[in-house]
């Protein structure tokens, strides 16, 4: 039995992951990991996720250069959600979202509608190679 066996993977073999900026506490994004992604993350010290849409491993920053250096990994009390405390690299200020924003959580509910409350820091057309 390994440390990976302590995790309660969902029926698809996935684990929900929250990426939080270590320095500020900002929640950057939500993603998924499978067993291989988590093992690679621990080995590399950089976030590697499972892309459900692409059906493959996704090393964060592989196309954009916006790599997430993992500073701490914490498993929740039920062993079924992972918190990654990361240093977001590749742009200053940091960009974690594919929309060119700091965080994927840039929409706020106000007065019956969703409103973008974070600026686009870099046009996504100039991010991806």
Curated annotation (Swiss-Prot):
Quote one Gene Ontology molecular function term.
Answer: magnesium ion binding
Known catalytic reactions: 1-(5-phospho-beta-D-ribosyl)-5'-AMP + H2O = 1-(5-phospho-beta-D-ribosyl)-5-[(5-phospho-beta-D-ribosylamino)methylideneamino]imidazole-4-carboxamide
**Free-text function comment from the UniProt entry:** Catalyzes the hydrolysis of the adenine ring of phosphoribosyl-AMP.
Family, similarity comment: Belongs to the PRA-CH family.
The gene it comes from is hisI
What InterPro entries does UniProt report for this protein, alphabetically? PRA-CH, PRib_AMP_CycHydrolase_dom, PRib_AMP_CycHydrolase_sf
Q: Protein name, please?
A: Phosphoribosyl-AMP cyclohydrolase
Per the record, the GO terms for biological process are: L-histidine biosynthetic process
- Assembly and partners? Homodimer.
């Amino acid at each position: 039995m390994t440390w990976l066996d302590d995790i309660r993977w969902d029926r698809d073999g996935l684990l929900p992951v929250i990426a939080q900026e270590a320095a500020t506490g900002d929640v950057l994004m939500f993603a998924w990991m499978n067993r291989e992604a988590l093992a690679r993350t621990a080995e590399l010290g950089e976030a590697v996720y499972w892309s459900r849409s692409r059906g493959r491993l996704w090393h964060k920053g592989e196309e954009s250069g916006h790599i997430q250096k993992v500073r701490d990994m914490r498993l929740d009390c039920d062993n079924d959600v992972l918190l990654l405390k990361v240093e977001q690299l590749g742009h200053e200020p940091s960009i974690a979202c594919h929309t060119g924003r700091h965080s994927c959580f840039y929409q706020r509910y106000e007065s019956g509608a969703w409103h973008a409350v974070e600026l686009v820091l870099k046009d996504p057309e100039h991010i991806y190679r």
